[in-house]
């Protein structure tokens, strides 16, 4: 009987002890102002050169409506090919303008695809929301602006009734995926340097804590969910201060399937580390592919991979966006093992994705 009582007391005391431990932990981290540091660092903007283009000859410069009575700026570029194969919405990286899409899209334009690039509010020539200061993180404002861009494409006289593709760089890719998760009009997705909130924030929080505390148990022994908890608290505080919301791409990316996704990322990216990108990629459902471009820093995969990059993106959209009667001879990857050995198999009669030998496949259960 005594052992039953001991077991019962232990069972009842365990939740109390856990609650007490969490309370003490919270007070310790609060005393160290860890949450304040999380909020402050979350708002720090990365330092890198943002590409900005100049107006493109022959482009259709447009302004279209968004919520809060704003007018957003964009450019519509028509293909030089005789037959249009599809329309692609281009999502810009943080701070750039719509004309910067050209280096990414020249090959697409020459091969049958129209491109529509646009600037979210408080960026480029788009109107600004009073009191809103954009960060590198996607908020509900960029999400709503991307939805407005999709609506604009649907309303054009030359709209493609079958839908559009998405090609997004960094923040523009994140906003595009968030919008596409709610809109089947987007049929396929290519992203470069894309990132989400928690899969980026939690690893950095583990790194930051070593700066503000030399306690081993804080640095190593705390479980990941503790960092997620503080991350959520930090985002809630920042949401109140900024009067915006930070949507979770980790949830939305699961809703993209069965539409195909190609994620491109640089192996030398020091802002969004490859393991962060892979953690996000694993949350997506098949069909999906991941290409880690060797030696590329953040948003520098095009500069490193060059023609290989252009051809990979083109063939992806040819395979998944263009009409299937395309006359080209596709190249098909037989399986990840053949990819590792550099073996490519040509197959006539059906569209298939041609990918570079360096494309990295994760196993089907990822």
Specify the residue positions occupied by each region the protein language model found.
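Conserved alpha/beta-hydrolase
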Residues: 108-129
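Catalytic nucleophile-loop/oxyanion-hole region of alpha/beta-hydrolase
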Residues: 124-157
């Amino acid at each position: 009987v005594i052992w039953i009582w001991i077991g019962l007391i232990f069972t009842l005391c365990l939740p109390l002890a856990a609650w007490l431990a969490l309370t003490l932990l919270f007070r310790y981290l609060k005393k160290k102002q860890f949450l304040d540091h999380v909020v402050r660092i979350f708002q720090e903007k990365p330092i890198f050169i943002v590409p900005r283009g100049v107006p493109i000859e022959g482009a259709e410069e447009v302004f279209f409506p968004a919520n809060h009575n704003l007018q957003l700026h964009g450019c519509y570029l028509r293909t030089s090919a005789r037959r249009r194969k599809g329309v692609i919405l281009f999502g810009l990286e943080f701070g750039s303008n719509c004309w910067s899409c050209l280096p990414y899209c020249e090959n697409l334009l020459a091969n049958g695809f129209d491109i529509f690039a646009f600037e979210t509010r408080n960026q480029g020539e788009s109107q600004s929301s009073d009191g809103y200061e954009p960060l590198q993180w996607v908020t509900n404002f960029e999400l709503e602006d991307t939805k407005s861009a999709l609506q604009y494409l649907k309303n054009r006289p030359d709209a493609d009734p079958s839908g559009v593709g998405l090609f997004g760089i960094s923040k523009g890719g994140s906003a595009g995926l968030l919008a596409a998760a709610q809109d089947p009009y987007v049929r396929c997705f290519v992203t470069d340097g894309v990132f989400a909130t928690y899969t980026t924030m939690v690893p950095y929080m583990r790194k930051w804590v070593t700066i503000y505390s030399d306690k081993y148990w804080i640095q190593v022994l705390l479980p990941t969910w503790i960092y997620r908890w503080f991350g959520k608290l930090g985002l809630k505080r920042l949401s109140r201060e900024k009067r915006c919301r930070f949507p979770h791409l980790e949830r939305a990316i699961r809703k993209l399937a069965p539409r195909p996704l190609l994620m491109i990322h640089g192996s030398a990216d020091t802002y969004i580390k490859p393991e962060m990108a892979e953690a996000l990629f694993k949350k997506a459902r098949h069909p999906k592919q991941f290409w880690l471009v060797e030696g590329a820093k953040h948003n520098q995969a095009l500069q490193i991979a060059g023609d290989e990059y252009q051809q990979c993106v083109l063939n992806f959209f040819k395979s998944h966006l263009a009409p299937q009667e395309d006359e080209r001879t596709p190249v098909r990857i037989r399986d990840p093992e053949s990819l590792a050995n550099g073996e490519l198999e040509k197959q006539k009669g059906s569209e298939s994705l041609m990918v570079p030998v360096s494309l990295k496949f994760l196993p089907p259960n990822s």
